[in-house]
Swiss-Prot record:
Keyword Transcription: no
Record's subcellular location: Plastid, Chloroplast inner membrane
Annotated transmembrane regions: 7-27, 107-127
Membrane topology of the entry: Multi-pass membrane protein
Superkingdom as given in the UniProt entry: Eukaryota
Family of the protein in this entry: Belongs to the CemA family.
Plastid listed as a keyword: yes
Pfam families found in the cross-reference section: CemA
Gene Ontology process terms (BP): potassium ion transport
Encoding gene, per UniProt annotation: cemA
Catalytic activity: K(+)(in) + H(+)(out) = K(+)(out) + H(+)(in)
Keyword terms of this UniProt record: Antiport, Chloroplast, Hydrogen ion transport, Ion transport, Membrane, Plastid, Plastid inner membrane, Potassium, Potassium transport, Transmembrane, Transmembrane helix, Transport
Protein name from the UniProt record: Potassium/proton antiporter CemA
């Protein structure tokens, strides 16, 4: 009986991690054909924002320059000029097709993310008692660690997320969020966020150390300061 009670929260933890993802993935596959059909039959006009329009124009200009360079190498003839126009036409259609696919992926990502968040929220509310048990296990585990181990864990977390080598990780995380939400990444915005977010989190973390850890466990703070120095 005790083993069963201990197994239930672990099963709940595994299900809360994988079940929302599995359901949203299944819904994504079910909606994919419907969204594709709706987009291809119901959309008579392609709507682009400034970033998407700029990206598409840059790709088109690059393609046009490459095709023009290829034709410059050959002899100019009426046949080659016709082939040049046909090549631009085909590649333009391909670029528009890719843009359509990106728009459909944006709709699917947005829909499945809403479904995933709704399932996760509902599952968390319904399993509140199991979350309390998991929280007590985590607190007990941390309580049994030595002060040195706790200080090392704090150092590992801060170095991983806020260290001098963390900007590539922040950039990857921000790009992943952009892709999941289905928004086209803006390089300037990403650069600004990579510069600002670590500073904000580092300031909040240091305030937490000064405000709470000083009174809760001065020994951990002392060990942490000694290691960082």
């Amino acid at each position: 009986m005790a083993k069963k009670k201990a197994f239930t929260p672990l099963f709940y933890l595994a299900s809360i991690v994988f079940l929302p993802w599995w359901i949203s993935f299944s819904v994504n596959k079910c909606l994919e054909s419907w969204v594709t059909n709706w987009w291809n039959t119901g959309q008579s006009q392609i709507v682009l924002n400034n970033i998407q329009e700029k990206s598409l124009l840059e790709k088109f200009r690059e393609l046009e320059e490459l095709l023009f360079l290829d034709e410059m190498i050959k002899e100019y003839s009426e046949t080659h000029l016709e082939e040049f126009g046909i090549g631009i036409h085909k590649e333009t259609i391909q670029l528009i097709t890719i843009q359509n696919e990106n728009r459909m992926d944006t709709i699917l990502h947005f829909s499945t993310n809403i479904i995933w968040f709704g399932i996760l929220s509902g599952y968390s509310i319904l399993g509140k008692e199991k979350l309390v048990i998991l929280n007590s296990w985590a607190q007990e585990f941390l309580y049994n660690l030595s002060d040195t181990a706790k200080a090392l864990c704090l150092l590992l977390v801060t170095e991983f997320f806020l260290g001098y080598h963390s900007p590539p990780g922040w950039e990857f995380a921000i790009r992943s969020i952009y892709n999941e939400v289905g928004v086209v990444a803006n390089e300037q915005t990403i650069t600004i966020l990579v510069c600002i977010l670590p500073v904000i989190f580092d300031t909040c973390f240091k305030y937490w150390l000064f405000r709470y850890l000083t009174s809760l466990s001065p020994s951990i703070l002392l060990i942490y300061d000694s290691i960082t120095e």
